[in-house]
Amino acid sequence: MLDESSSSDESRATELPVSSEDECEEVTDAKVLPNKVLVVFEGESTLFRDQLLDTVFGVQDQGNIVKQLSWDTKYYAVEYDLYVDECVDIHGWLNEVNSDDYEELRDLLTMIIIVRSFDSTQDTKEYNSVLYDFIQGNSVSVISVNTNSARQVKDTYDEFLELDASSIEFINYHDDRVEKETNECKGMARLKEIIDTHPWTDCKVVLKNKESTSDKVNKPDLEYLIDTLKKAKIHYQKLSNGSDGFSEEAEQFALQMATDIANNL
């Protein structure tokens, strides 16, 4: 847990600093605040904590709260705060964060990354149920990283994706392959790719391909636009509700992407 002197119930998330009264009082305009990314490690998955935080976020032994980080890609940069937590039982942790006491925290979060080692033969149904309850009422993106074997990951992830592919992504920590047919990365490379294409909201995103000079007319970056359209199509399909219509979240995402692309033409 973030606070070693906290309650003996280690599955609780009540000591998360982002929910403190002092910080909540500072929130005057959420639209100018950095998005908050929360990474939680369950049980033995804490063994991968240092490596994951360094590989994905470039954070090395900087405690449980790292503010004013910048996620930089070739085309944009966005400021965010990183929060790190540990728990013994992710089911209790998710239920706690999904309670009314944590409504303000959930409103500030843009992404939760759950890192855990789980066995599909033991706790799939319970984990499914807790995740389903959590994602139904929240707009935060959830990424589940399994540090268990690749075989168990495959079996479990297929079942999860049928549950709700629109709101959660699943990654095998140990998988470093690249799919030949789709050229899609796996493992930590996939995690970074998901963050690259994450629809950041309520924060300042600085586009990098908007520079112009007085003697040269700005031309659209076709490679960027094509790549963006491909990723947007995949994300939009995941946001569909599986019927003839599409979810409100999918429609909002489509509108946002159309605006972003138009601004780069």
Curated annotation (Swiss-Prot):
Residues annotated as signal peptide: none
InterPro entries attached to this UniProt entry: Irc6 (IPR034627)
Top-rank taxon, per record: Eukaryota
GO biological process, one term: vesicle-mediated transport
Gene Ontology molecular-function annotations: protein-macromolecule adaptor activity
Residue numbers spanned by region Disordered: 1-21
Keyword terms, alphabetized: Chromosomal rearrangement
Entry coiled-coil feature ranges: none
PANTHER family, A to Z: INCREASED RECOMBINATION CENTERS PROTEIN 6
Family: Belongs to the IRC6 family.
Role played: Involved in gross chromosomal rearrangements (GCRs) and telomere healing.
Name by which UniProt lists this protein: Increased recombination centers protein 6
Organism: Candida glabrata (strain ATCC 2001 / BCRC 20586 / JCM 3761 / NBRC 0622 / NRRL Y-65 / CBS 138) (Yeast)
Lineage, broadest ranks: Eukaryota, Fungi, Dikarya, Ascomycota, Saccharomycotina
Originating gene: IRC6
